[in-house]
Amino acid sequence: MTETVTVSELAEGLGAELVGKPTRVIRRVATLCDAGPDAIGFCSNANYLEDLRATGAGAVIVRAEHVAECPTTALVVDDPYYAYAAVATRLHPAERPPAGVHPTAVVAEGVTLGEAVSVGPHAVVEAGARLGARTIVGPGCHVGTGVEIGEDSHLMGRVTVADRCVVGCRVILHPGVVVGADGFGFAKGPGKAGWRKVPQLGRVILGDDVDLGANTTVDRGAIDDTVLEEGVKLDNQVHIGHNVRVGARTIIAGNTVVAGSTTIGCDCMIGGSSAITGHISIADGVILMGMTGVTGSIKQPGAYASPLPAKPVREWRRNSVRFTQLDDLFRRVKRLEAAQSTGEGDGGDDGD
């Protein structure tokens, strides 16, 4: 379902300056290349100015410095991409399933369902769970005993929220998400006694406006809770270990792993396939480039990176061999420096 609005209505909603025809009707969003007169696009990068000049869009969201390049009605804002997100949400609102419990769903006694809650096919909601108003539990989901879910949250297909976990308002859990599985806790016995499982007694607490991508997993705490504060966004296939705390508005890209008992600050940006060791802390405002390995605490905000860029195979092999020789080279350089220092000293004495 799409909504039809005029450009002036969109500009008012965005607080944007309007340059052009205010009565033009917009029905959809589109790329600059594919947009027609009923569509709105955006340009947030100077690399796309050629596409902007040639666009057939009815309107375009642009920065002030690009208005002269825009051949159609312009909505002028500081951040076109951020504004585009609001416009796309308005023009293409998500469709809601009907309120109520599907005949194939299982809802235990003692469950509290808020107004207009939807529980989809084959979903299971265990005893004592509380679902806030307008929350959607999708097909095949499992909501454990005593779980609390706030208003306007959406569990898509096959999501698991395990016993006693807490999910805030307006939270989105994409297909396959698991919240509250046991953390990885085992104690090694003497000799060949093997490993003894350590009970994981904490919960997972997700703040308001958290978004977890498909097949992402967040383990429950061993004793204390695992906490993702408000506004945290995780991409697909991210793993958060037990007792981790992720600060508000931090965003983590796909395939990243955060080991147990690590604290990540607020407003951090973590690139894909990064690996963060356990029992460390990362300050507010840290940016980790993709594939960064973090083995110790980061105490100052800023950008950090550790991946090796791709090289031709032959060059990479030579450098790999040289890397194994670094210790020997270091010792040789130290000996040469010591010898040079001694020689310079002897030369000075002879001169006297």
UniProtKB/Swiss-Prot annotation:
PANTHER family: UDP-3-O-ACYLGLUCOSAMINE N-ACYLTRANSFERASE, UDP-3-O-ACYLGLUCOSAMINE N-ACYLTRANSFERASE 1, MITOCHONDRIAL-RELATED. This is UDP-3-O-acylglucosamine N-acyltransferase. PROSITE patterns: HEXAPEP_TRANSFERASES (PS00101). It comes from Alkalilimnicola ehrlichii (strain ATCC BAA-1101 / DSM 17681 / MLHE-1). Pathway: Bacterial outer membrane biogenesis; LPS lipid A biosynthesis. It catalyses: a UDP-3-O-[(3R)-3-hydroxyacyl]-alpha-D-glucosamine + a (3R)-hydroxyacyl-[ACP] = a UDP-2-N,3-O-bis[(3R)-3-hydroxyacyl]-alpha-D-glucosamine + holo-[ACP] + H(+). HAMAP family: LpxD. Homotrimer. Gene3D superfamilies: 1.20.5.170, Hexapeptide repeat proteins, MurE/MurF, N-terminal domain.
